[in-house]
Amino acid sequence: MLTITVAQDGSGDFASVSEAVLAVPYACAAEIRIGPGVYREKLVCEKQDITLIGAGMESTRIVWGDGGSLPHPDGRPTHTFRSYTAFFRGIELRVRDLTIENDAGPGAKVGQAVAAYVDCSHTLFENVRLLSNQDTLFCAPLPEKEREKDGFLGPGRFAPRRPTAQYYRHCEIAGDIDFIFGGADALFEQCTIRTVNNHLPASYVTAPSGRADGLGFVFWDCDFVSDNCPAGTVFLGRPWRPTGKTAVLDCRLGAHIAPEGFSPWQSRTDSDLACFVEAGSTGAGAVARGAWVKQLDSQQAEELLRCARKLCRPE
């Protein structure tokens, strides 16, 4: 395996993460070790097998500030899928011990602001902090069709919609609107899911768009917290596409979580095809839900978690 070091003080092989990634031959497995510092760069990583390791979430930060409604160099708006701070496409991806942040600002001012756009066959994020406001983490693939012109403008617009398996462990993910979204099969274990308070009437954690026969998003043993959001104003999710799925298992929910738990997508009438399930929730936000949210018994929850680990956890 190729090993490359990045250090801003000149002691490494490169001074920027982007330069290090570009130096890796596509088919060569590589480990890039990134020293402390704020790396202000828009990262594009399209490699077959790559590992990025920082010096810790507090120490190594990759930051950029594009927003979906801000102008792009081509004269059009940037749109959601060109706003990313880091774009990953490949086969095997491992990211550890760093922060990826989009600091463009609140969605009301700059639109969607993706921190990480993840489109790899197998992904591991461990001890990673993902920070933004609207649309923080995009778990590819995209849906088959866009609903508005240029809605999918970006690196994956014409790419095949291939399944991806993504695993997030001991991560912190922060945002306010649909800040974990997409069509991946993804397992979030022992993560902190933090809703940022931008004084919105309602916020949404997930916006799944996966296949009807897919896993969707599964959260196990996670803490759902907020930056002092008003009680009952944050939904665990809403379906970005009709067959979206989110499961919340053995998680701790703050008082900011809405009593309904999940919400339909705006005024659409096909949300009854979505699947939102819950089991073992505790905390002030763990209350009786409506009929739309299925409550799993312990055996069903264990089986779902087993399937999620088999599909998403690295071997």
Q: What annotation goes with each model-predicted range?
A:
Residues 2-315:
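Sequence-level preference for short, compositionally simple segments enriched
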